[in-house]
């Protein structure tokens, strides 16, 4: 196991649980999709600050559950699957955030909401958005004079857990807007289905991929880390979306220079001339042209260990740790290479690091692309490539 990898995973699990403290042991575990909730509100009026003795954390505890009154402010329930006794408390919480000007159109927020049901502390994602069309149940006399605005809330897991998926939830809201603008029949039921599926569609894909591939997950991790193209065959659309989502989240896109990533993708494509092919025609997916290394194998085991707890939020945290460790190793290698340009002992340290880190094959390709225009570094990398090739030949 990589140094501190297991400790990191254990720590993340404890953090995710402690962020939901106050509930029972069962509540601190992942809530199944059936207990995730949503609320859709229509919003009309000014977002001028109306300070009403808000608590520091915006908690609705000890406040009236009714929407703040006033001709310039209206927050009306359009649809929800929350229990009726809980929804007014959530509405009060959202109304406070709106009145303080703390919510901006199209940018989701994540908070922890403590409702009056004993021990019910839950993560809440909420987002304000404008839409061209009004839902039938939200049409009023003043609708034509005001832009149609809505606030959507997704509740489930913990604040820390939902924060990991905030960007995906922002994209999910864009999908909701597209659905609301459709002319299709049965629009209301379609939107209701879309809202109620948020947990399954946004939070659970990584978990489903881990459970599907098991030990073969190492091939998927290696493909994501090395920017190797992946082709999925004989698969249903849901599984294909899950795999593509996993690859997108697992890649280092956004964490390394965009030009480096583009060059690396081109280099990997030219070098291999083949994509990794995943055949899903049988119950156990089969891989062709797949690669792996010790680094990916160790992290695959971390995912399988996490599967025992059944927490999809933990899978996402492990995936984030996987990427951070890869970036850390890449930065360490760059530092060693800079030192090795003037120091033979540093060159040896560089070689030993590559040999022991578990992902030397991929890291060397990344830094090779980044240092393409630097002659001194290119010489060091050429020597390291020769050392690694000799070490590989001796291992057979």
Swiss-Prot record:
Pfam families: Njmu-R1. It comes from Homo sapiens. One of its GO terms (biological process) is vesicle tethering to Golgi. The gene is C17orf75. Component of the complex WDR11 composed of C17orf75, FAM91A1 and WDR11; FAM91A1 and WDR11 are required for proper location of the complex. Interacts with TBC1D23; this interaction may be indirect and recruits TBC1D23 to AP-1-derived vesicles. Its main location: Golgi. As component of the WDR11 complex acts together with TBC1D23 to facilitate the golgin-mediated capture of vesicles generated using AP-1. May have a role in spermatogenesis. The modification Phosphoserine is found at residues 8, 18. One of its GO terms (cellular component) is Golgi apparatus. The keyword Phosphoprotein applies. Highly expressed in testis and also expressed in fetal testis. Signal peptide: none annotated. InterPro entries: Njmu-R1. Residues 58-67 have a biased composition (Polar residues). This is Protein Njmu-R1. It is found in: Golgi apparatus, trans-Golgi network; Cytoplasmic vesicle. Keywords: Cytoplasmic vesicle, Golgi apparatus, Phosphoprotein.
């Amino acid at each position: 196991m990589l140094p501190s990898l297991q400790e990191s995973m254990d720590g993340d699990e404890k953090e995710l649980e402690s962020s939901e403290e106050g509930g029972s042991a069962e509540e601190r575990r992942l809530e199944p999709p059936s207990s995730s909730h949503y609320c859709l509100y229509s919003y009309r009026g000014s977002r001028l600050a109306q300070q009403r003795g808000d608590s520091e954390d915006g908690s609705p505890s000890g406040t009236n559950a009714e929407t703040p009154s006033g001709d310039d402010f209206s927050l009306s329930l359009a649809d929800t699957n929350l229990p009726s006794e809980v929804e007014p408390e959530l509405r009060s919480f959202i109304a406070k955030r709106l009145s303080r000007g703390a919510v901006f159109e199209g940018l989701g927020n994540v908070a922890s909401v403590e409702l009056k049901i004993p021990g019910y502390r839950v993560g809440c994602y909420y987002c304000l958005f404008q839409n061209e069309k009004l839902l039938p149940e939200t049409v009023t006399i003043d609708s034509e004079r005001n832009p149609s605005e809505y606030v959507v809330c997704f509740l489930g897991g913990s604040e820390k857990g939902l924060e990991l998926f905030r960007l995906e939830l922002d994209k999910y809201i864009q999908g909701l807007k597209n659905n609301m603008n459709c002319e299709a029949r049965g629009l209301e039921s379609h939107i209701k289905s879309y809202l109620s599926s948020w947990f399954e569609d946004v939070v659970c894909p990584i978990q489903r991929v881990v459970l599907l591939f098991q030990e073969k997950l190492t091939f998927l991790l290696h493909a994501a880390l090395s920017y190797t193209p992946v082709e999925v065959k004989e698969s249903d659309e849901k599984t294909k979306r899950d795999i593509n989502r996993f690859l997108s989240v697992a890649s280092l896109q956004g964490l390394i220079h965009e030009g480096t990533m583009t060059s690396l993708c081109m280099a990997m494509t030219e070098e291999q001339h083949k994509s990794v092919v995943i055949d899903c025609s049988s119950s156990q997916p089969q891989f062709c042209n797949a690669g792996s290394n010790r680094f990916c194998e160790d992290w695959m085991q971390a995912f399988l260990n996490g599967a025992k707890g059944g927490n999809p939020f933990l899978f996402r945290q492990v995936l984030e740790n996987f990427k951070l460790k890869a970036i850390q190793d890449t930065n360490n290698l760059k530092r060693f290479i800079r030192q090795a340009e003037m120091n033979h002992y540093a060159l040896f340290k560089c070689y030993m690091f590559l040999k022991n880190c578990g992902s030397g094959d991929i890291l060397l390709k990344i830094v090779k692309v980044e240092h393409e225009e630097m002659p001194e570094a290119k010489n060091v990398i050429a020597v390291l490539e020769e050392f690694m090739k000799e070490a590989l030949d001796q291992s057979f």
